[in-house]
Design a protein with these regions (language model features):
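Metallo-beta-lactamase
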Residues: 39-41, 62, 68-74, 79-158
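Active-site HxH/HxHxD metal-binding segment of metal-dependent hydrolases
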Residues: 1-63, 151-155
Length: 158
């Protein structure tokens, strides 16, 4: 995790308590804790400390949010503890891909904890696991679909 993705956790916890939302940020707490001050200064953002995690997530774990079941897929590379959350719903397949995948690209690996080889393995894993009709919601900017990325993203051409 990076400061720009965990900054809202404290506010959410103040409203809803230790909910599933906090679990999304808890996979690898060493990177944000070690670098959060550096990230705040580099990006010029103020983010409250997210506090202690309520649960650490691992590959295959599930999170229930209402009647939706989110499956945890470990996707290190942008950060060591990166995850994607996938749900197959009546309305269609959806994946919260964070900064692992972007339209035509992938997340940065030049920041602290980034690993180019790991993110390439993560993209290959997503290409095999996620159905083509999956809508991918990114951590920044536009959404995409697995079908589009499999056709157009040079980092998914394996």
């Amino acid at each position: 995790g990076h400061a720009d993705h965990v900054g809202g956790v404290a506010g959410v916890r103040a409203v809803v308590g230790d909910s599933a939302l906090y679990e999304l940020c808890a996979k690898d707490v060493t990177v944000p804790r070690a670098n959060i001050e550096e990230q705040r200064a580099m990006w010029g953002i103020e983010t409250p400390d997210p506090g202690e995690p309520t649960r650490l997530l691992a590959e295959g774990d599930t999170i229930e949010v209402g009647d939706v079941c989110l499956q945890v897929i470990e996707t290190p590379g942008h950060t060591p503890g990166g995850i994607v959350l996938f749900a197959a719903t009546e309305q269609g397949n959806i994946a919260f891909v964070g900064d692992t995948l972007f339209p035509g690209s992938h997340g940065r690996t030049d920041l602290s904890g980034g690993d180019e080889a790991a993110i390439m393995r993560s993209l290959s894993k997503l290409a095999k696991m996620l159905p083509p009709d999956t809508v991918c919601l990114t951590g920044h900017g536009d959404s995409t679909t697995m079908a589009r990325e499999l056709m157009q993203n040079p980092f998914m051409q394996m």
